[in-house]
Every structure is written in C-alpha cells, then in structure tokens.
Amino acid sequence: KKVTDMNSMFSNCYSLSNLDVSNFHTTKVVDMSYMFSSCIKLSNINLSSFNTSKVKTMHGMFFNCKSLKSLNLSNFDTSKVIDMNYMFLKCGNLDNLDFRKATFNKETKHIAIFSKVPSNITIITKNEKTKNWLKDKIKSDNITIA
C-alpha cells in the first residue's frame, strides 16, 4: 500500500538541518500539509524525486523554515493543489525558489503564501501568466521565466 498522507511528517524537527527524501514514493500522496513546518534549522532538502501530481494540499508545507535559503521545487506539479495557504510563511531567509512547474487557478487558496518572505526573493516560473500571479502575491520584480 502506498502512503497518501504526509501531513506534519517532519514538523517541528527543530534540529534537522539536512534532509534527503529523494527515495520517497509520493505518487499517491494527496496531503503534504505542514510536512516540514517549523524545521527551523533545515537548510538543505532534496525533493528532486517528489511526484506531486495528486497532491491537493500543501498548506503550510514549509511554514517557519527559517534557515532555507534556496528551494528547488522545479518538479512540483501543482495542478491539483487547492490549498497553498501559508506554504512559505516565515521563510525569512528564502532568496531563491525554483517553482517552474507550478500552476495557480482561481480555486487555489493562497492566503499569506509568501508572507514574511524577503521581497528580493528570486523565483523561477514557467510563463507570463504565472509570473504575474506570483508578482502580485510577493510584490517582487525578481521573477524569471524558465
């Protein structure tokens, strides 16, 4: 049986600084809420093999990950995600985010998705529509189309 719920899996792992979850099988996962929330020392994470095509909620997924400076989510398919509220809230040192496969629609909840993230963050995205959506949420001009 495959895992479908990873809610709070590593939440509050205060001493965790490096994490390689590249061997995780996530093809059936629908909930990644708070998965890494408050991992305040987490500075390096490998999510390169994550299949997020069925995920519906990423609510607070990286909430309060204060030590993350760069995050590669280039393989994240967010087409089915309906809740991204607080996803990067309080990631105060995040200065580089590769979010090139991310899509957003009217139904996607996104309250405070980038609240307390540096305004000079560099975000890589896939098209002009997504760039404009992100620009409106983060109030940054450092959004690049890949």
Task: Enumerate the language-model features and the residues they cover.
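Negatively charged
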Residues: 1-146
